[in-house]
Amino acid sequence: ESELFAELRHLADQLCSLFSKNLEKYDNDKHIHTDDLPGWKDHFWKSNNIRKAHLKTIEPVGKNKMWLMHINVFPSIYCDMPIFGLDIVATPNKVSGVFCDYSKTYNGFSTDLMQEYFRETVKDLSWNRERELPPWAKEIFSVDMMAAGSVRPGEELDQLCETALKLTSFYLESSSIVPYKTKIDTTAAQNKYCENQKMNKMLHSSILAMGIPEDVKDQYVDNVLFEVIK
């Protein structure tokens, strides 16, 4: 059994606890394929200022030999807050991919403060590398996006876990004090984020490579992962 997977599972549990402490858990009735996605576990939360927080883990089952965690937190469309995203992909011996961002949906004071905190938190991480992003990603992610192609067990992994917890805690604490303003409407920006994420060819090919049928993948991506606000 991989020690790395055990550490990452512990991180996922800690993050779930943070979400449950700050938000209200709910069942997502659009997630209709729970039995068709072996090894997948999806959790959902919401609050007055968070319309959907989603944490998903995928265990190495069947064709899939990797462990994955995906987090997206979408604020209310009436809040001056970025979208929070975190993805971790690991093989049994190393973390092979990390992406994390506070992605702007509104040019406002709260978003600027939150992005400044993000910048300060990630700027000195030695394993954080600037990556050339595809056009769909450049349109939605911030210039300070955290990205790594390899994080080694030990000190680097400890830093990653600590950073993930810090960025999640700060985001959730901020969400409870950011004012709700009906003159703000970030529907278009949030929908653009979801539409652009769906342009990621790796997203689709990686799910299909796990042996998930195309129709199940499409329903999940369009209605659970990145559904647009109608």
Predicted regions, residues:
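Generic detector of well-ordered alpha-helical segments enriched in charged/polar residues
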Residues: R9, D13-C16, S20, Q115, ...
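Alpha-helical oligomerization segments
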Residues: S169, E173-K230
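Short Lys/Arg-enriched alpha/beta "domain-start" segment
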Residues: E1-C79, I83
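Intrinsic-disorder-associated interaction segments
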Residues: E1-L8, A12, N107, P153, ...
